[in-house]
């Protein structure tokens, strides 16, 4: 049995090594005679000698082609003659291949990217894991001493546990009196003892859980620090770290390192992938979790070490048990694909298919197509086609349902219609199958490459299903089920917390994309289009910041649609050198520099070191902005504006209001003409409502005139005369419902303010003075209100600074806009409610939620600079690095400052975060700053040396500035033509920012996207970088060698045709009602029929339809369900004849659902499905909400569990679990990523994060839980997803306390 293969180098030549197990013994076989090669297709075979002369250099050594032979192959089924070019060493291939490809005699090269050892296995027909050898498996796990914030492997390893079929033991270096614990003198001795265990037991397979990322790298690091060799390999070698995409993988020579984590993530969809969660999901048994802080506490105090040792031993034991279950499955996969299990267990589904096809292509003498380059990959991503047919479900509770499914619909179509790249539109063919709707033709004269391979795989899946039905072992059944359902879904989106700047109704706003899209979809529910799990809403009046792909110039383009999608899978948190960051799904694209241009790279393709596109400048609309105070006040509640009045001088307006109303009534035929009507008619003409003639008038805006009349009906009722000040006065609340009807020409004549206080004009011009005042406030200002001694409210705004000159300027500006102010030692105070309202509405109050006012973004550049100057004076400084530094606690404000700076052409920005404060560093000259020393050229104003090397083909020792680059081109030292390739980098609106960190995480929830007109890109993330909208384009495996868009759309077209054919025959000829269809299956019933009749007719139909379906297409009877209901597409629940409830899309399995929510949902499902009683389900919910309201639910059912996934200082949004964790950390408890926090939400005021306490600290005598929170955010959402299918709303499900009335209520009052 072959376990693995690699190669070593001796005397400059490769030697293949095959690691084997044979007759129970481990052995290594060597092959010194296999040479690396690639294929080349030449324009003319006579040029082979020219090609053979091509040379390259590798580490100072000349690389050349050492031999060439002409061979006959097939390419997509067609005969082709190519040259096989041989090389001395595998590393020669990447060194020379581009030179061969670029040679004028060469059309293309092939199979140049197949690793040498894998090539050997394919060519020699060797299959890993084939044979009946019994392999020795051993699992191990480590426990470490970790404190929050420590670097990786700083703390010692305190225990190493291992398990195999014979025993499970723990090695440690502190006294623990347990039979399975072996105690040694030190960490060093513990590692040496573990190495001895490995030598003695000599396992073929070493099993870990996340050993690639944690256990083995940690062990290697500690061994290095202790000066110990770690010869775990059978050849005496130490573990070898390898980069596989974005992750590190660890190889142990001669042994298979089987990291379960990768396999389980690929195979099973779980809400969390802790070892405990996986073990419970597979075996149905709980496993205790001991957290890092508990381990550290036990080790440091000596108390509880037995518990830690038991936990460590169980970790190894559980890892071994899981390994025993999963290893045979991966061994089968390794055998099928023909590649080593180490590689297979770490491969995506797409890569596994590729390796299978490569092996089969070699066997059939087919030349494998190349993987797509970046441009081709980008083109494929933009292609789209229609998917499977989904029928909206029939709502309601249904009895007697049958499930009918096509057996492997798409593979069956591929085989039946011979759908393959080599059969597509094949010339000279006698017989074709033509795909419906799309019209592509597939030749039937010979079997296509892919269809001929698929039948074996199809049969294998059917065999798995047969085994599942026959199996009585629940674990085996579950494992088989997981395997056949291992489908990975890619969504092309960004996460809800990411920021996006948009222009909506002419105003620049910065949103969290999740809040923005959710809000739009909630407000436009009837317009949302749903396709599977994806929701799309077409929109108007919204614009995004994008760039033109050709010119690289910034633009503002219309958003065509907003998109939301359910997603479970990996996401990538990408951090750039500037501090910008974004979290995106695997399939969403950012713009990466490649070969002189910007191309899209998906989340899983972006690598550390890549250069991403970020804005140098953005285009903001410029206009003279005016602040409408009335609009601000209308956003406040009536309680907040009860003391606000509007006033206007009497002079020139005596009797104006009544006269205008009488004139309007006369115009509408309700009164006689007033004597002074001409005065009012002239005013109406000035407002644009009428046009005066020599005699009479014409109404030119009747709708406007009617609204104006409504305004005056109200004004005449409420306006009062104030004789003391000879003014008319109106209470704002009296006209708040009509004030927006007042024309601006009239409104600007009024003043507005508090009843007995300061009043100001209704409009404020946003000039440079006002902008600077706002900048002062946003930087170091505060606005507050408080209850005064009279029971009313007092308001004040303060602007702080230590510099008298700055305070003088603050005082001057404050007086200009708000009249009298107070001056303190280090502040200027504006004790006026109107000032409070303006600053609070425009800028926010708390340091954590301040923002750049929207009106600043769309003002002139001079106004924007003035705001920044005020902000800089208040909250900026010149850092020792000679950079301007702006500081704030508000993440929203950081994004606003970045956008503002970009709009002024400032791109040399770096973002930081320390001690709870965000820093914005600017390395460019700003209008209001002076530098004594020359600044360094910042990263966004240089051409990186790797781009220079790629462009000009020579090595540059350092990056060079744009200015220097232009000089070198002008002086002829750099090739002008080549320089044109990157001209956009100097003259466009894009700069490049390097990726410095990538973290892969698991995410389950909604993800979001925008579709932007023409450009299909937009700014997103913290600090903003360009993201690509790929919603319409990512179908299939875009990196595939045998990619074929025509094939894919033909398969789905046939799929839609066959499922529709089945539906029609089932309904018209067998009397069924089809309730729901999803791509390859359906649910149906015969209303009113008995179960036996429905089953009998369904089986008859299956026989009937299968006789009509062509080729391998086969409909299967999947099962009968007593009862079921459908909510929406992909959301339904059924109960089978054995009483088992099956749900899809309704489950609440995540930890952040409390037990009461899960329990209530389960009872609701039982009431509906087992008893057929929806009213009973509603009653259950009402009883639970009543018990919650009366505090009758035990606290253990209210605990919500959430995991800490990153160091606490990295959290920007403080959820309840983070708040509890921070309080624990403040008490000295060590909190680390992976720790699960259980909390209960208490009754009270303020945000939930401040009212959440640790579950163990909840005391019934002291605490009351927040019943409203648990009803509104836990129980009702859990059951609404079910009961909304039956027409129930949230308010129908709550227990309502009956209000006492009449005599009973009076008697109760009297008793008190």
Swiss-Prot record:
Function text: In addition to polymerase activity, this DNA polymerase exhibits 3' to 5' exonuclease activity.
NCBIfam families reported in the protein's UniProt record: intein_Cterm, intein_Nterm, pol2
The organism of origin for this protein: Pyrococcus sp. (strain GB-D)
One GO-annotated biological process of the protein: intein-mediated protein splicing
Family matches, as InterPro entries: DNA-dir_DNA_pol_B (IPR006172), DNA-dir_DNA_pol_B_CS (IPR017964), DNA-dir_DNA_pol_B_exonuc (IPR006133), DNA-dir_DNA_pol_B_multi_dom (IPR006134), DNA/RNA_pol_sf (IPR043502), DNA_pol_B_thumb (IPR042087), DNA_pol_palm_dom_sf (IPR023211), DNA_pol_type-B (IPR050240)
Activity across pH: Optimum pH for intein splicing is 4.5-6.5.
Record-annotated DOD-type homing endonuclease domain positions: 773-906
UniProtKB keywords: Autocatalytic cleavage, DNA replication, DNA-binding, DNA-directed DNA polymerase, Endonuclease, Hydrolase, Intron homing, Nuclease, Nucleotidyltransferase, Protein splicing, Transferase
Record note on biotechnological use: Used in the PCR method because of its high thermostability and low error rate. Sold by New England Biolabs.
GO molecular function: DNA binding; DNA-directed DNA polymerase activity; endonuclease activity; nucleotide binding
EC identifiers of the protein: 2.7.7.7, 3.1.-.-
Record's catalysed reaction(s): DNA(n) + a 2'-deoxyribonucleoside 5'-triphosphate = DNA(n+1) + diphosphate
UniProt-recorded name of the protein: DNA polymerase
PTM comment, free text: This protein undergoes a protein self splicing that involves a post-translational excision of the intervening region (intein) followed by peptide ligation.
CDD domains documented for this protein: DNA_polB_Kod1_like_exo (cd05780), Hint (cd00081)
Family: Belongs to the DNA polymerase type-B family.
Domain of life from the UniProt record: Archaea
Gene name linked to the record: pol
